[in-house]
Curated annotation (Swiss-Prot):
Domain of life of the organism encoding this protein: Archaea
Region of interest: Disordered: 1-38
Subunit: Part of the 30S ribosomal subunit.
Residues spanning the membrane: none
One GO MF term attached to the UniProt entry: structural constituent of ribosome
Parts forming coiled coils: none
Presence of the UniProt keyword Isomerase in the record: no
Cysteines paired by S-S bonds: none
Presence of keyword Cytoplasm: no
Record-linked NCBIfam families: eS8
Name of the encoding gene: rps8e
Protein name as catalogued: Small ribosomal subunit protein eS8
Any Pfam family matching the protein: Ribosomal_S8e
Keywords: Ribonucleoprotein, Ribosomal protein
Amino acid sequence: MKDQGRSPRKRTGGRRRPNHKKKKHELGKDTVETQVGEQRLKTVDSRGNTQKVRAVKTDVASIADGAETIEATIENVVENPSNPNYARRNIITKGAILETSEGQARVTSRPGQHGQVNAVLVE
């Protein structure tokens, strides 16, 4: 059970006593680490009778090059500033540098939240 509330410990190390039990709106979900591979999407129920689409695996990126957008295939993750191990494991996050059929591109979307990979070409 993921909890998005405060820490049960104070800054001094003392215990903070809870005012109430965990509520459903305070809960979070496990992250989806989007990997390079054949496209697989997952829908997750979210608040307000809506659904989120999460990309579990994907091999396609929408790359913006000036005024036009190109669909390119993702070959692998070159660099990932959020975590160096993500580049080794081919995990795509926002800010990751991808090797694509059109050249190197930097991811501008959050594939674990939006379900698709948007990127811009890197010179």
